[in-house]
Amino acid sequence: MTSLSWLRALDVADIAAITDLLAAAERADGNGGVSEDVRLTLRPGPVGGGVEHLVARAGSAVVGYAALGGTATERQAELVVHPDHRRRGVGTALVHALFATTSPVSLNIWAHGDTPAAAALATRNGFDRERVLLQLRRPLASVRPGDPDDLPRPIIPADVTIRAFEVGVDEEAWLAVNAEAFADHPEQGRWTLDDLRAREGEPWFDPAGFFLAERNGALLGFHWTKVHPQDPVPEHPAATDQPAGQPGPIGEVYVVGVASAAAGTGLGAALTIVGLRHLRDIGLASVMLYVDEDNARAVRLYTRLGFRRHAADVSYRRPARG
């Protein structure tokens, strides 16, 4: 018998059980099960950060988990079921509990991995496929045979300087440019100082890999890189033409943004190359990034820089019900 409960506060045991579930799903599926945003809310104490936590238990064991966030008019969720308890109605039970909480507003559910099982669950419950987030990759050695270094040198305008982010100094300027650059992005453009501070407190945060482009002291753009100690998605779907990832660290183009004053100048491409060269120079063999499938301009840029599809996450949407 599966029981469902909303957690109004998280204790160490809750977090350990959810983390163990996510680890089991990652081993089975080759992906993390939920996003970084959700993982950052798994902290002891009263539930906060705009995220609610739902667990499914079989006896005392946590066999399913859902995180619910979003806005008052557009809710967003992520859910995962333990590999040993799939095809037993746990996923459907979680979805129905989300319906009960979110109705009548619309609900988006992210599936990490573009799988037939996720698509079937979505279709059975009235969801439409709405958004695809691609994971692209490339090696940091040459991707062209015979070319020992196919990362071009970045072309930086003479009046633009590149420097590293300074904690305690650059947060407000960065948030302003980030909001401008991602004004139409459903997640990135809504970052707050708390969101930024949370990343600054993570073990992976390294300001030396967080590049800012300035003109006369004004921030024009940025490239924030990240290093994963272990590849978060080492296996790839058979439908892609990319080799499987390798155990060990991998770099990430975490986020690249350009202010409207510098749009169309090539600064975004230059900053991307600056970050790729940094990741290569610190000894990483490959790099990944996430980009919306319908962001044709960005996909073209990354394709020109040697990136290829490795995996995909899919958002399914159930419209508001009157």
Swiss-Prot record:
SUPFAM superfamilies attached to this UniProt entry: Acyl-CoA N-acyltransferases (Nat) (SSF55729)
Taxonomy, superkingdom: Bacteria
Enzyme Commission identifier(s): 2.3.1.189
Ligand binding (acetyl-CoA 1): L79, V80, V81, R87, R88, G89, V90, G91, T92
Binding site for acetyl-CoA 2: V256, G257, V258, N295, A296, R297, A298, V299, R300
Keyword field: Acyltransferase, Repeat, Transferase
Positions of the N-acetyltransferase domain: 5-150, 160-322
GO MF: mycothiol synthase activity
Residues binding 1D-myo-inositol 2-(L-cysteinylamino)-2-deoxy-alpha-D-glucopyranoside: E36, E187, K226, E252, Y290
Cross-referenced InterPro entries: Acyl_CoA_acyltransferase (IPR016181), Bact_Acetyltransf (IPR050832), GNAT_dom (IPR000182), Mycothiol_AcTrfase (IPR017813)
Catalytic reactions on record: 1D-myo-inositol 2-(L-cysteinylamino)-2-deoxy-alpha-D-glucopyranoside + acetyl-CoA = mycothiol + CoA + H(+)
Entry keyword annotation includes RNA-binding: no
Biological processes, Gene Ontology terms: mycothiol biosynthetic process
Role description: Catalyzes the transfer of acetyl from acetyl-CoA to desacetylmycothiol (Cys-GlcN-Ins) to form mycothiol.
Assembly, per entry: Monomer.
Family membership noted in the UniProt record: Belongs to the acetyltransferase family. MshD subfamily.
Name of the protein in its database record: Mycothiol acetyltransferase
Organism annotation: Parafrankia sp. (strain EAN1pec)
